[in-house]
Every structure is written in structure tokens, then in C-alpha cells.
Amino acid sequence: MSRSNSIYTEDIEMYPTHNEQHLTREYTKPDGQTKSEKLNFEGAYINSHGTLSKTTTREIEGDLDSETSSHSSDDKVDPTQQITAETKAPYTLLSYGQKWGMVAILTMCGFWSSLGSPIYYPALRQLEKQFNVDENMVNVTVVVYLLFQGISPTVSGGLADCFGRRPIILAGMLIYVIASIGLACAPSYGVIIFLRCIQSIGISPTIAISSGVVGDFTLKHERGTFVGATSGFVLLGQCFGSLIGAVLTARWDWRAIFWFLTIGCGSCFLIAFLILPETKRTIAGNLSIKPKRFINRAPIFLLGPVRRRFKYDNPDYETLDPTIPKLDLSSAGKILVLPEIILSLFPSGLLFAMWTLMLSSISSGLSVAPYNYHLVIIGVCYLPGGIGGLMGSFFTGRIIDMYFKRKIKKFEQDKANGLIPQDAEINMFKVRLVCLLPQNFLAVVAYLLFGWSIDKGWRIESILITSFVCSYCAMSTLSTSTTLLVDLYPTKSSTASSCFNFVRCSLSTIFMGCFAKMKAAMTVGGTFTFLCALVFFFNFLMFIPMKYGMKWREDRLLKQQRQSWLNTLAVKAKKGTKRDQNDNHN
């Protein structure tokens, strides 16, 4: 009696949410019976179309002689059937809960970057008196922090994409702690300006690199939720910083602010050193591969249960990105000058710069008539903005993920029906930016009302409500823009994220530097009216990349491929000419 194996393979297209644990598939066994089987999608991977797929191979072993003789003999033996499933290695070994744990760790690291600027605002008046400087001079320390907050990530992002996320984050936090100690003990105003630059250079890259980390362990259908949450939670320091700074300054003095930053960031540094894993896919794959360099290894992976959970003894080497990373410190600039990128980011950066002015206006506007609020009460007035930012980062991520799933499903259906070419790619600019437009136009109205509320001394409720809406829109804008960049450049996600960081911080620096003169010339209400008009106009520019962005990218790719082909031909021709010359010489 002979035995035979029957093998077939199927490719399953899936669009699961985190609570869809299985899919059911039907198949026919050798005895003719139809069976159903639940398939776990832990081994799912992203296919060339950007959708989640899983390849399952079943081997059905049975007694085929018994099956063929079943019609001629009643004394037959039931076939022994064995079903095994072989799947591709999972994209990441992190569970859904562990992904949120990573978001918490990244928020803990990057929070100190956004906190470093607003926590300093309540101390400005004390610095003026202690060091005998005027308002313009004391604002220099605010401007230089914002300036290096935009410049530093464009360099550090390239380092993180080359050498790994973990060492750059840890190095930045350590520099921040050392600079904060120096600021707490600073003897002169010149030292404060210098150390504020160092402080910003150290911690600023953590925001962009955090988005790169999230891009390492998420797929497109879930990326909006996690990137949005990380980006939004990290920047909540700008909402609550003034409240914390006001309490510390009122209870002690301005030096207490920097001791607080030293202790807080130092504690987070120790936690991150112990548990933050390396996620760069060229180094760690799906987290099952042990990094070669010691600095890329988290000590927690020395524990037996953690090693077994992340398969350190049986790594999935096929998940290792074969791309050899090359250090290119100008890569952020090369991305930023692309027309579809700058047209997508500039309106959002302008909106975010207005949010920075709004936070500054609350501090300065509520401290004078007709409000004359105490420093701590002003800090409490930042709470609605903090809550709005928290809601904006959380809900927007889920909204853009839901919209992406719906659009990719329709896209695949149209492709299957022959309505679009099989090699077509979904328009990521349109899928992401269409979610950005409503909140950007809503923000124009909110900022306009906020500016005139401060200017005319309207009831405090109007200021609190509009600051809530403005913060919601600002965090929504940040989440969507960052997600778009990670989608477009998954292998350079830290560098790409730093582009928006550069745009928003550069614009914030310019407007903060000009804000005092603009208020003197146009009043607060007039200043916000002018900026709202700019945002309203530039919002329409986003329709250009929505329509032409993918075409421009495809044209550049074809041009690069053509140039590469010509270079290859030139090299071969040169070698052939040299060979002919050698033959003639011989």
C-alpha cells in the first residue's frame, strides 16, 4: 500500500484589526470531504501592494490506495491525515499590547524635548531681573531652543537610520541631562544661552526617531494609530509645560525647573537603557535577531523569559532588511526639497507654528489686564489645550487607519476587476492628506477666534474652548503628516520624520522671533488674522501633491533606473574598450 502527499499553497489577503485573531478558510481533503480551518494571522506580512498577506502551505498525508479502492471494498481503512502550516515569519514579534508599551517608552523619552521649551516660559521674568536683560534678550533662549529643535533631528535622523535607533536616543537623553545640570548651576546669562543650545541638540532628535521606531514594527493598516499616538503624546509637554514651570517657579525659583528636568529625564534614561530594544530592521529584523553591537542591545533581553519570547535562540533571519545602510547626513534635505513633500508639509508646519504662538499668547495675555491671573492659574488654563492635544493624537490615528483600510480594500477590488493596472500603487498622498484638510480648515476658524479673544479681553471660556480646538487640530496635523512620511520612506523613517520636525520648528522659530514686533504693529488679533489667511491659502496647495505626488515619484524612479542602466552600459563599454586595447597590445 503506497502513500502520497498532497500539497497546495494559498495566499490570503487580510485587513485585520487587533481583535481579529483568526480567519476561516475551507479546503477539500483527499477523501472528498470539505473542512474548514481557523488561520492565525500572526505570520502575516506586507506584500508588494501594501496589504497584509499570509502564505499558508498545507501538507495532507493520506492513504490514496485506500481512497481509490473505497468503491470496491467495504473493508477500508480511514486515511491518516496530518495538516501542518508553514507561514512566513511575523513582521514583528511585538503583540498588540507590547506595541502600546513601546509607545509608552517612546513617549517617556521624547516628552522631555517638548517640555523643555514651555516649562521655561514662567521663568522669563525672573531671568530678566536676575541677569538684568531686556525682553528681547531673554527671548533669545526660547528662539535658540526652537532653532536647534528643528536642525538637530535632520542630522541625527540619518545617524539613527544607519547605526540604530536605540544608541541615538540614549545619547540624546544623556546630553540633555548633563546640559540641564549645567543650566541649574549657570552663573551667567551667556552660559544659559549656550547650554540651552546643547540641551536642544541632545533631546530634539528623540521625537523624529520615535516615529522611526514605530515605523519599524507597524504595518500601514495600523501605522496611523501608533505613529499618531506617539507623536501626539510626546508633544503634550508643550501643553502642560507651562503649568509645571509655574508651580516650580512659584514654590522655588527658575533653577528648580532645570533640576526637575535633570531628575525626570535622568530617571527615564535609566529605564530606557534597561528596556528599550533596537528596532531598526537592518539590525534586529522583527526583534528576534540579536544586534551585533553592545549598545544596540537592551539588558532586559538577557532574561530567559524575554529571550524565549523574542526567539533569540531561533531568530527569523529572513526578516532582516538586506539593505546596507549608508550614512548620509544630507538625506533629510534631499527629501525635503522634493515638491510633493514640501507642498504637503508646509501648510501643516505653518499651522503648528501658530500653535506655538497660541501657547505663548496664553502666558503673556492672561498675566495682564483685564485678566491679571496668578502664575499658577495661568498654568491651569493650559489644561484644556493639553486635553485637546491628547484627543487629537489618539482619535486622528484611528480615523486615518480606518480610512486607509477602506480605501485599500476598494483599491484591491478595482484591481481585481481590471479597473486599474495590476502594478498600480495606491495614492498615499491622497489617502493621508484628505484626512488632513477638514481639521486644517477648522483650525483657521479656531485660531482666528482665539486671537481676537485675547486681543479684546473676551470671557476666559472663549479662550479655553478655542485653545482646546486649536490643540486638537495641531496634534491631528502632526499625526497625519508624520504617518505620511513614514509610509513614503519606511526604510528612512527617522530621517523622513525629521523633515516635518524641521519645517514646524523653523517656522515656529521665525514667528516667535517676530511675534513681539507683529503684536506691536497689528495687535494679537491682527497677527492671528494674518497668519490664518496664510494657512487658509496654503491649505489649497495640498491638492497639488494629492493629484500629482505619486506621478512625480514614479517619474523620478524611472529616471533613476534609466540613469543606472546607462551607467552600467558605460562601465561595460569602458571595460570592453580596455580589453580590446590589451588584446591589440598583445
Swiss-Prot record:
Localization of this protein: Membrane
Name of one Pfam family that matches: MFS_1
Transmembrane segments: 100-120, 140-160, 167-187, 189-209, 226-246, 256-276, 335-355, 375-395, 434-454, 460-480, 524-544
Bias (Basic and acidic residues) ranges: 19-40
Protein name: Probable transporter AQR1
GO cellular component terms attached to this protein's record: cell periphery; cytoplasm; fungal-type vacuole; plasma membrane
Stored InterPro entries: MFS, MFS_dom, MFS_trans_sf, Sugar_transporter_CS
Membrane topology: Multi-pass membrane protein
Family per similarity comment: Belongs to the major facilitator superfamily. CAR1 family.
Topological region Extracellular: 1-99, 161-166, 210-225, 277-334, 396-433, 481-523
Biological processes, Gene Ontology terms: amino acid export across plasma membrane; monocarboxylic acid transport; transmembrane transport
Gene name for this UniProt entry: AQR1
Main function: Probable transporter that confers resistance to short-chain monocarboxylic acids and quinidine.
Residue numbers spanned by region Disordered: 1-44, 61-82
Record key words, sorted: Membrane, Transmembrane, Transmembrane helix, Transport
SUPFAM superfamilies the record matches: MFS general substrate transporter
